[in-house]
């Protein structure tokens, strides 16, 4: 209940603030004249208070009603002590406090607690006094008839009494409206309420009568009324607290009851489910017991039938075992004969294959020797050609050197002639200048001479001048011609020098290239010679290995032929005893093991041979690349390798044997077609392996084909026919 106490404390603080505000407002309004209603008749006021309706509102209405009540109470106190005349209000103003007083408070927290005063004995005496309500009413009526207008003190006392009564009734009715269920069962009886109301009314009347004689008695009665009001408030508060606790308990019990009901309902549902499940299980158990009983009867019948069938089966199995033993004995004899024949055939085939492989290896070795001889001859021819080319280049270089020397000599001669021409030109210029100077001197002397000479002298001088001018023009033309020749010789000399420099550089480059080619040819020749030596050694090793394998295979073939002969003798002389059969079986097992071992040896030898063949092919490719590298014109003629039988350089597994292709019918044709396809694919692979250019072309062709297919797939859009279906 901590929140309840906190709420009560907050309400008390709020009431204290409201009291302070009301006191300040009353002090400001003490100068103004306020009038109360003329209805001083207490029974009418009491009836109006008892018959007024109570309205519920928000907390602001409760606070305003409490503030109005406190304001009215303090107004009566101030009017009684200071003898302030208070007028009657208007009808709307008189009814306003009653309406606000009639509004019930939500709880007793708005009732302000006050300290108990010392005159408790007087309060109890006053409460135990025997004054009655009707006499008070009569006296009030008489006094009303005597004096129509009461003094301000009497009206204020009556208004204070009415407000106190209304506040008490409002608090009681509020508590009753908050807990209607509890008040109906646990609240005070109505007689007690009426007695409290009558006592309050009688107290109000006594206060009214006592307020007429003097102010001291009125203050005493007011204090008594305050005490009584405080006691009533305390009682109402205690009752409210009890009612709240009872309400809380009732709510808790109601919640517990609801929870218990929910639990009971859950238990009932669970019990009903469990009952239903048990019924279903019982029904299933009954059905299963009936089915088990039916199946037991069926099992008994089936057991009898099974016993009969077992007897029939046992008899039949005995007969079958006898037949199978005979069949196995016959099949064993047949298998032994066929296995011996197969072994003989296999040994013969292996012998033929070994001979064929030996022949092929010998032929391939011979071909390789011939190819190497041809390659060596070609290399020697190429070396001779290169030597001749080097000698020719040296000759060309010497000739070019000679030409360069001749050109240099010509240049020197041209330079000397040019210098001599320049010297002659300078000398001629000097001579011409001297002649001109002498002529000018003559002309000047002639001019200075007497002008009285005859016409002959003047004509002679004029003729000489014309001749000199003509000579001068001729000299100028010759000088221009010589200058043109000099320029031409200079340009020719520059061209010759540039040509000489370019020819010298080209000759140097050619010499450097030739020297590089000679060095490369020498290095490649050394490498090829080393490779040839190594390959010769490898061929020797291969020949030795082949001879060894041939000898071992021949010895094995002889051993197998001896074993076959022994087995044939044993087959002709075999007996039907168990001991001879066991010996034959052990012998067959030994033969099969030896065959398996020999097959593994043959496979290992074939793998070694294949590896050697691969090494040879790699060396051939290196030789081919070395031969085609320095001289693009040189090539190896391998036309004789692909032609003829036995030209395969490695032991590629054939799909079918050549001995089995001679069979007639569809089976033989299929074998022939498969073997021909196999041979073609092997030759194609060898061709692509030997010629890398063909491989490059095939790769480019496949890439272009795939690219074209992708372009077609991505760019092709099918034709969309927008015709309607059903031929419309």
Curated annotation (Swiss-Prot):
The post-translation modification note in this UniProt entry reads: Highly phosphorylated during mitosis. Phosphorylation is barely detectable during interphase.
Q: Give ranges for the Cytoplasmic compartment.
A: 2-695
Q: How does it sit in the membrane?
A: Single-pass type IV membrane protein
User: Where in this protein does the record say Phosphoserine is found?
Assistant: 116
Q: Name one GO biological process term.
A: Golgi vesicle transport
Topology Lumenal: residue spans = 717-728
Q: Name one Pfam family in it.
A: Golgin_A5
Q: Where is the composition biased (Low complexity)?
A: 152-167
Locations of Polar residues compositional bias? 173-187
Coiled-coil residue spans? 216-628
Query: Which residue spans traverse the membrane?
Result: 696-716
Query: Which locations, inside or outside the cell, does it occupy?
Result: Golgi apparatus membrane
In the record, Dimethylated arginine modifications are located at 27, 89
Supply one GO molecular-function term: protein-macromolecule adaptor activity
Function (record text):
Involved in maintaining Golgi structure. Stimulates the formation of Golgi stacks and ribbons. Involved in intra-Golgi retrograde transport.
Assembly description: Homodimer. Interacts with RAB1A that has been activated by GTP-binding. Interacts with isoform CASP of CUX1.
Q: Mind telling me what this protein is named? A: Golgin subfamily A member 5
Organism ancestry: Eukaryota, Metazoa, Chordata, Craniata, Vertebrata
């Amino acid at each position: 209940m901590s929140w309840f106490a906190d709420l009560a404390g907050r309400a008390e603080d709020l009431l204290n603030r409201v009291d302070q505000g009301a006191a300040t407002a009353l002090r400001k309004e003490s100068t103004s004249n306020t009038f109360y209603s003329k209805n001083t008749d207490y029974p009418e006021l009491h009836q109006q208070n008892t018959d007024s309706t109570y309205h519920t509102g928000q907390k602001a209405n409760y606070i305003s009603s409490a503030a109005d009540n406190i304001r009215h109470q303090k107004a009566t106190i101030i009017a009684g002590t200071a003898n302030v005349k208070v007028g009657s209000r208007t009808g709307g103003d008189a009814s306003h406090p009653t309406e606000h007083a009639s509004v019930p408070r939500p709880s007793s927290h708005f009732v302000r607690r006050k300290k108990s005063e010392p005159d408790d004995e007087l309060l109890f005496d006053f409460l135990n006094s025997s004054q009655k309500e009707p006499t008070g009413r009569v006296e009030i009526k008489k006094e009303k008839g005597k004096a129509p207008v009461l003094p301000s003190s009497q009206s204020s006392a009556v208004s204070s009494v009415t407000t106190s009564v209304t506040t008490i009734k409002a608090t009681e009715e509020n508590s009753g409206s908050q807990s209607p269920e509890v008040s109906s069962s646990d609240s005070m009886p109505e007689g007690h309420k009426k007695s409290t109301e009558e006592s309050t009314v009688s107290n109000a009347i006594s206060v009214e009568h006592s307020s007429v004689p003097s102010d001291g008695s009125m203050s005493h009665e007011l204090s008594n009324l305050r005490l009584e009001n405080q006691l009533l408030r305390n009682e109402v508060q205690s009752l409210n607290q009890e009612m709240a606790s009872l309400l809380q308990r009732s709510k808790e019990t109601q919640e517990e009851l609801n929870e218990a009901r929910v639990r009971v309902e859950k238990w009932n549902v669970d019990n009903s489910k469990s009952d239903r499940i048990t019924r279903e299980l019982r029904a299933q158990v009954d059905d299963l017991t009936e089915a088990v009983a039916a199946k037991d009867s069926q099992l008994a019948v089936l057991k009898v039938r099974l016993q009969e069938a077992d007897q029939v089966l046992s008899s039949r199995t005995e007969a079958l075992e006898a037949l199978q033993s005979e069949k196995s004995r016959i099949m064993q004899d047949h298998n032994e004969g066929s296995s011996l024949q197969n072994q003989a055939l296999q040994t013969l085939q292996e012998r033929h294959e070994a001979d064929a492989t030996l022949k092929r290896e010998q032929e391939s070795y011979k071909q390789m020797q011939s190819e190497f001889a041809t390659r060596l001859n070609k290399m020697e021819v190429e070396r001779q050609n290169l030597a001749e080319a080097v000698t020719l280049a040296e000759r060309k270089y010497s000739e070019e050197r000679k030409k360069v020397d001749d050109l240099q000599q010509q240049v020197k001669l041209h330079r000397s002639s040019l210098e001599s021409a320049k010297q002659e030109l300078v000398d001629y210029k000097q001579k011409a200048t001297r002649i001109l100077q002498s002529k000018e001197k003559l002309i000047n002397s002639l001019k200075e001479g007497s002008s009285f000479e005859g016409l002959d002298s003047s004509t002679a001088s004029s003729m000489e001048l014309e001749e000199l001018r003509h000579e001068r023009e001729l000299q100028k033309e010759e000088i221009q011609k010589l200058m043109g020749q000099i320029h031409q010789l200079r340009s020719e000399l520059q061209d010759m020098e540039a040509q000489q420099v370019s020819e010298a550089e080209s000759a140097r480059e050619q010499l450097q290239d030739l020297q590089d080619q000679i060095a490369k040819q020498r290095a490649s020749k050394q490498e090829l010679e080393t490779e040839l030596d190594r390959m010769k050694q490898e061929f020797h090793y291969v020949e030795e290995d082949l001879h060894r394998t041939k000898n071992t295979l021949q010895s094995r073939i002889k051993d197998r032929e001896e074993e076959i002969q022994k087995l044939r003798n044993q087959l002709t002389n075999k007996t039907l005893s168990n001991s001879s059969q066991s010996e034959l079986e052990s012998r067959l097992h030994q033969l099969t093991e030896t065959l398996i071992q020999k097959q593994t040896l043959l496979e290992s030898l074939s793998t070694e041979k294949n590896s050697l063949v691969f090494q040879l092919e790699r060396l051939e490719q290196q030789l081919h690349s070395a031969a085609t590298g320095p001289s693009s014109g040189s090539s190896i003629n391998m036309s004789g390798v692909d032609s003829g039988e036995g030209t395969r350089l490695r032991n590629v597994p054939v799909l079918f044997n050549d001995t089995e292709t001679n069979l007639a019918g569809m089976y033989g044709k299929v074998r022939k077609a498969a073997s021909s396809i196999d041979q073609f694919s092997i030759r194609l692979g060898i061709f692509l392996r030997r010629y890398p250019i063909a491989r490059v072309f095939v790769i480019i062709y496949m890439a272009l084909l795939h690219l074209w297919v992708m372009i077609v797939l991505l760019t092709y859009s099918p034709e969309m026919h927008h015709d309607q279906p059903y031929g419309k």
